[in-house]
Structures are given as C-alpha cells and as structure tokens.
Regions:
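Active-site hotspot residues in diverse enzymes, especially metal/ion-binding acidic/histidine motifs
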Residues: 1-360
Length: 360
C-alpha cells in the first residue's frame, strides 16, 4: 500500500488558500497534530485522511501520490515580494499540481519535437564575433534559430509550444503576477499563465518568462539584473530594433496604437522599448506615463489583440479521452482530482481574457 505523502497535504492545503490553523479548525484536529502530519512526524490514520480530503476537496488518493513540491526559481524573487504568504503558497501549489498533471499525462503521450528552448550562458556565448554578445544579439539569434520572418511574432504561445514548451492556463487568484515558468529535468519547459490577464500584457510577460528560461536557468545573478535582462530580451525579441526605429517616426498615442495593432504588444511595452533604444527622451517618456495614468491605461489598455490560446495540454487530455478511451471519471482518477474539478480545469476553456475597445 502506498504511503501517506506529507508534501501533498501541504500542497492541498495551500492550493485552497488555507493556513494550517484554518485547516485544523475546519477538520477539528489540533494544529499540533496537523503540523506533525505535514512534517511527516506522524502518519494520519485513514479516517483522518478522509476528513482532510473532504475539507480540501481532493480525493483521498491525492495524499498518497509520490513526488515533491518545487518553489519559485531564484529569478522570480521580486515577484515573491509582491505577495502575501497565503497568496504565494496558492500560486506555488497551483504550479506544482499542474506540473504533476503534465508528468502523469506524459506517461501515455509521446511529445514529439525536434526543436527546443535553448539555454544561453552570456559569458560563454560568442555568436558570430569575438566580442561579448548583447541581448540584441541573443534575440536576433533566437529569432534566426526558430526561423522567424521579419515583423511581429504571429502567435507567441504557438511558437513556444512548437519549440518544446507547454503553456498552462492557471488561476493564480491575484493580478499581481501574469505568468511564471519552470525548467525541470525530464519535463518540457513549463509556462504558467494567469487567466484573465490582458492579451497584450500576456505576450510581453510570456516573452519575459521565455527570456528567463533562455538566460537564467544555468547562470544566476542579482535579482534586479535578471529581471532587467529578461525584460530587455523580451523587448528585443518581440520588437526588433531596426524595425522599431523605422516605424517610430513620431511618439504619441495614435502612433503607438497603430504600432500596437501591428506588433500585438502593449503601448507601454513599445514605449519602454523606444526608451531603451534611445528613440525618445526621458521627458517624452515621463509625459507618456502621465497621459497613460490619466486615461486609466496603465492597468488595462484599449484595443487588445486577439487572445492567444495554448493547445498542447489540451491535446494531451484529448488524446487520453479520444484515443485511449478515458472517461471523465478516469481522467479525474489519473490526475487525483474530483470529477468536478477535472471539468473545471480541462473542459474546453473560454478565452483567457476579455477585450476592450477604444471608444472615440
């Protein structure tokens, strides 16, 4: 018989946004007893496991699955500082549970891809010259490696998944984080995208996470430096310098709106990129942000591009159901979920975000 896994109890509790004391109160266990269950000092009897399962809405088998939890990678330290301990625990739990789903689905589903998401050490990578490469060089090299034409990336989610990644829609329960990423041995690179985030912002954030996966899984630096590098590489990848220079003939909201429609990234991203390329002055940048604040565009801009939809995880689920004959009950058992939660997570999903239109 499998053993109770204390890591799964912590994972289940945090995924429901419960503190240890709140779960103890809901189950009528003493917090000391619950603490011993979570640390592995005490194995709960079957009736206690059933009581815990009822409160956190997971089948009892959830607690007997093997595995461990992973925390945030080092380059997400700044994101951690934004969140309360409870909100942070919920996000980490969501990521871990979704990762374990990918692992279990992968047992019967062969993922074929001759492409990959590279890892680049800036200290070793030389590119085509003897000089140390810039982030512009890395962005150019990545676009060439993936054989992208000039102009905007047509569909970033599709591009990442075509090159070996898996994008997983998640409900983080907070709008402070749009996306996260993980590179773990034996799995594709995973990107967790917060449902409800604006489409234009998701594209930049997803490119930012891609940059972390390219630059920072083998080389760790100061947190602020890693964030700055990821942001700059994302901008260079989505908005190639030569094309931005040729298009940005004037700097105002009308021109930025036109460029947004073409590049499918936010006006804010274009403005930051223009400042990085020294195409605008600090004063122009300051006035731009003042105007964006007055119009209420800093949180959500008008004229969002169409929301991109990931497909790989959906295909994995459909393969099990259509090719292997799994019912909803079977899928729930495979993933250690209730049937209701399986349907919530993996039924055909609505668009990840709604769209706003500019009213003249």
């Amino acid at each position: 018989m499998p053993c109770f896994n204390p890591h799964m109890l912590t994972l289940a509790r945090e995924s429901r946004g419960l503190t240890q004391s709140e779960l103890a109160a809901a189950t009528n266990f003493g917090q000391g007893t619950l603490s011993k269950y979570e640390t592995g000092m005490l194995a709960p009897p079957p009736e206690a496991v059933e009581a815990l399962a009822a409160v956190v809405s997971y089948p009892a088998e959830f607690f007997y699955q093997a595995g461990q939890s992973y925390g945030f990678p080092p380059f997400h330290y700044r994101k951690r500082k934004k969140l309360s301990a409870k909100a942070l625990g919920k996000i980490v739990a969501e990521m871990n549970i979704r990762r374990m789903h990918v692992q279990r689905l992968s047992l019967s589903y062969e993922m074929k891809s001759n492409r990959f998401i590279p890892e680049i050490d800036m200290d070793e990578y030389q590119g085509r010259s003897r000089k140390r490469p810039t982030l512009e060089d890395v962005a150019r090299s990545l676009r060439e490696t993936w054989m992208l034409p000039a102009g905007p990336v047509a569909n970033l989610m599709e591009l990442i998944e075509d090159n070996g990644g898996i994008i997983i829609p998640c409900d983080f329960g907070s709008d402070l984080i749009d996306a996260m990423s993980q590179r773990i041995d034996g799995l594709p690179v995973l990107f967790f995208v917060n449902v409800g985030a604006p489409a234009d912002r998701v594209r930049h954030t997803l490119a930012h996470e891609l940059a972390h996966m390219v630059l920072h899984t083998t080389t760790f630096k100061d947190d602020d430096e890693m964030e700055r590098e990821a942001d700059d590489l994302a901008g260079a990848f989505l908005l190639p310098a030569e094309e931005v220079r040729s298009q940005l003939r004037r700097f105002d909201l009308r021109q930025l709106a036109n460029m947004k429609s073409y590049w499918k990234v936010s006006m804010a991203s274009i403005a930051v990129r223009a400042e990085r390329l020294n195409l605008i002055t600090p004063y122009q940048s300051k006035m731009f942000w003042i105007e964006m604040s007055k119009l209420g565009y800093r949180k959500r801009e008008p004229n969002e591009p169409p929301q991109e939809q990931p497909t790989k995880l959906r295909r994995m689920v459909e393969y099990h159901q259509r090719k292997l004959g799994y019912s909803d009950d079977d899928m729930a058992k495979l993933l250690f979920l209730t049937v209701t939660e399986f349907k919530r997570m993996y039924a055909p999903e609505p668009p990840l975000a709604r769209h706003l239109r500019l009213v003249n």
